[in-house]
A protein has these predicted regions:
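N-terminal acidic leader/helix
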Residues: 3-32
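Acidic, low-complexity, intrinsically disordered interaction modules
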Residues: 22-84
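Short acidic DE-rich linear segments
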Residues: 89-92
Length: 92
């Protein structure tokens, strides 16, 4: 299983994940992969940067760089990502 992060460079940036070649907008797919509830995921994501929720997921409403978002994500979800790595998953 592979999980990658990319960030669109539009007015508002979406964090988009590729989970097993399926692109998802920060929705239940990624929270399921991380093994946490969608509500917990969204609450913890708010620790990373300013966000607001849409039915499609979380839109970043912040001036931080794409790289900083990815780094903050890795720090916030470090314990979950360690578990994923143990199961052969990579976060790019």
């Amino acid at each position: 299983m592979e999980i990658s992060i990319s960030v669109s460079n539009k007015r508002n940036r979406y964090i988009i994940f590729n989970v097993n070649d399926n692109w998802v907008f920060c929705d239940e797919s990624i929270s399921t992969v991380l093994g946490i509830s969608l509500l917990e995921y969204k609450q913890r994501f708010k620790n990373i940067c300013k966000v607001f929720d849409t039915k499609y997921g979380i839109i970043i409403n912040d001036k931080i760089s794409d790289e900083e978002v990815v780094e903050r994500f890795k720090q916030e979800f470090a314990s979950e990502l360690v578990i994923l790595k143990m199961e052969g998953c990579e976060l790019i």
